Design a protein with these regions (language model features):
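Short hydrophobic alpha-helical runs that function as membrane-insertion/retention elements
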Residues: 27, 67-69, 171-175
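Auxiliary Fe-S-binding modules of radical SAM enzymes
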Residues: 85, 93-229
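Active-site-proximal loop/turn and secondary-structure-junction residues that shape catalytic pockets
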Residues: 1, 30-33, 70-76, 109-113, ...
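Conserved non-cysteine loop/helix-boundary elements of the Radical SAM core domain that shape
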Residues: 1-64, 71-95, 120-127, 186-187
Length: 229
């Protein structure tokens, strides 16, 4: 949306040019909560919820695989959470035949540390493990046309992430070699390639390495370096 705005291009022109230049997928960040009431209060300067959805429709039309996200647990209502899921489901239902559209959905709780919402408005992250588990389970039920539901171990930690694997999630995501957004807002959790596999096994599942497009790959033998975060 920002490129379109400063360059004076349409969504189709922008995404077509990016694909021609080699881009084959696009993350679903920036969805936050799609309600414009919420967006006006927590993400001024970002596009409207409808424009976010429109951009995703065009991305799917030109053959780009994307993901969809939700950042909840701040000022949104329960109804706005459900509306968010319904609108994402509707966009996925409109994807061209043969295209992936949204390949995954990821919900994570608002991380409040050092944010303006916390300092100015006193909004804190009060999302419990039970509430996050319910959010993942509801996402699985309400998004039957999105194959993969990813848990956000980065924001909720290993123990809660393990529970979500039994409650609708089928993907732990990546180990995130570098992440500077939610970690700056109080998400301290970290995994290595071996420790994330151990976590999955302890939950009763078999780890599977995958590509961005969820193609299975053989897990190589790795020697890990200790990284001081």
């Amino acid at each position: 949306a920002h490129i379109c705005k400063i360059g004076g291009y349409t969504h189709l022109e922008t995404l077509s040019a990016l694909k021609e230049a080699g881009m084959d997928s696009m993350p679903g960040a920036g969805a936050e909560i799609l309600s414009d009431r919420v967006r006006r209060l927590i993400s001024k300067g970002k596009c409207t919820g409808q424009e976010w959805l429109d951009i995703m429709k065009v991305a799917h039309k030109v053959g780009l695989t994307t993901s969809a996200t939700m950042m909840f647990g701040h000022i949104e209502t329960t109804e706005e959470r459900f509306d968010h899921l319904v609108r994402i489901r509707e966009v996925q239902a409109q994807k061209p035949e043969g295209e992936n559209g949204f390949l995954a959905f990821i919900a994570w709780p608002f991380m409040d540390d050092g944010t303006l919402l916390q300092r100015v408005k006193g909004i804190n992250n009060n999302t419990s493990a039970d509430e996050y588990l319910r959010m993942v389970a509801i996402s699985r039920i309400m998004l039957p046309n999105i194959k993969n539901i990813q848990t956000s171990w980065l924001t909720v930690g290993a123990d809660t992430a393990q529970l979500t694997l039994h409650g609708g999630a089928n993907d732990m995501g990546s180990i995130m070699i570098e992440e500077n957004v939610v970690s700056a807002a109080g998400a301290p959790h970290r995994f290595t390639a071996n420790s994330i596999q151990k976590c999955i096994k302890e939950a009763g599942f078999i780890p599977q390495l995958r590509t961005q497009l969820y193609e299975e790959r053989e897990i190589p033998v790795m020697e890990e370096q200790l990284i001081d975060y």
